[in-house]
Amino acid sequence: MSRSETLFNNAQKHIPGGVNSPVRAFKSVGGTPLFFKHAEGAYVLDEDDKRYVDYVGSWGPMILGHSHPDVLDAVRRQLDHGLSYGAPTALEVEMADLVCSMVPSMEMVRMVSSGTEATMSAIRLARGYTGRDSIIKFEGCYHGHSDSLLVKAGSGALTFGVPNSPGVPAAFAKHTLTLPFNDIEAVRKTLGEVGKEVACIIVEPVAGNMNCVPPAPGFLEGLREACDEHGVVLIFDEVMTGFRVALGGAQAYYGVTPDLSTFGKIIGGGMPVGAFGGKREIMQQISPLGPVYQAGTLSGNPLAMAAGLTTLRLISRPGFHNELTAYTTRMLDGLQQRADAAGIPFVTTQAGGMFGLYFSGADAIVTFEDVMASDVERFKRFFHLMLDGGVYLAPSAFEAGFTSIAHGDKELEITLNAAEKAFAALK
């Protein structure tokens, strides 16, 4: 029995499902989840000392690669001064200044401790600001596990085939209107009917929780226009895309400015951090300036701020995102060529340093229906074949993959060699 199998068996005694986040259980791909003990650069090392090229990157934060020495040094320096104060620090002021200088929509920002907390708070703020109750989200998009957002959600909800989580009261769900992603006409029609009741539209500008689905041409622009017409707050959930698809996030990449944005993952450099912010007029409604309450014991935690500040400064160097995108493109082109050579229906998607892999004969992946029509069983086999070849992909057909600046020619060679063998075995 492997060390991972032993640990997983032990974990199930006191941890529900043996994991602390559902997708880690490998339920959607089968087999025993890997337990890791070390990560460095583009690699993770499991408890049985097998090394893998990592395309999960802790689900997005590790854009520099694992254990970047500058980030580790920043955290070590802060450790000498304490773990948490529950009081303001200079680091959180520096972080706020830096984020607002990078992201087009950010005039004010508040730090929280997770992406879920950020989206939950942004929606509460939008409701308080507008005096309206209803929200619009999109089918297959995941915005964290707060009650009102677990209606037809993506990510783990898709992985386990549970679009509406038990435990969400009907009274909460009735205020959540769910529309098809990339369908701007459905948005216009709905706002034309109930626009005066809608506080906000929340959207992943790139849907990263039904794998990776970029916006159709005109979709984000159409959302901006529709929100302006009906007095609705437009929220971009940039927990995945923020600082990854471009330094200023998807809003900079696509040239569409939301009213509020939410962030997580990269902003903490691997530490548990989230943030939300946007227009000063709206953000001034947050306590203690305004009546909308939001608070957090560990918000602005100095260790997390140290890691996040260092990460954001490092990714600000000229050419960083071009290099990240170029590697991702080379890797995806190589996968596509090998799938085509093996006669395997296969489609890839990309937004900067994030990507999607679909076993599908479709010309493109644009809608939730396109995603759900992909061959999940074939993905399961591919996942394990790649794992055997030393490549760790996201353990679900509905999760995006991530590259880092630490991925280079050697990692590309390992990845494509493993893929060539995997596609041949899938015939």
UniProtKB/Swiss-Prot annotation:
SUPFAM superfamilies: PLP-dependent transferases. Its cofactor is pyridoxal 5'-phosphate. The modification N6-(pyridoxal phosphate)lysine is found at residue 265. GO terms for cellular component: cytoplasm. GO terms for biological process: protoporphyrinogen IX biosynthetic process. Pathway: Porphyrin-containing compound metabolism; protoporphyrin-IX biosynthesis; 5-aminolevulinate from L-glutamyl-tRNA(Glu): step 2/2. It is an enzyme of class 5 (isomerase). CDD domains: OAT_like. It catalyses: (S)-4-amino-5-oxopentanoate = 5-aminolevulinate. It is found in: Cytoplasm. Keywords: Cytoplasm, Isomerase, Porphyrin biosynthesis, Pyridoxal phosphate. Pfam families: Aminotran_3. Its EC number is 5.4.3.8. One of its GO terms (molecular function) is glutamate-1-semialdehyde 2,1-aminomutase activity. Homodimer. Belongs to the class-III pyridoxal-phosphate-dependent aminotransferase family. HemL subfamily. NCBIfam families: hemL, PRK00062.1. This is Glutamate-1-semialdehyde 2,1-aminomutase. It comes from Pseudomonas aeruginosa (strain UCBPP-PA14).
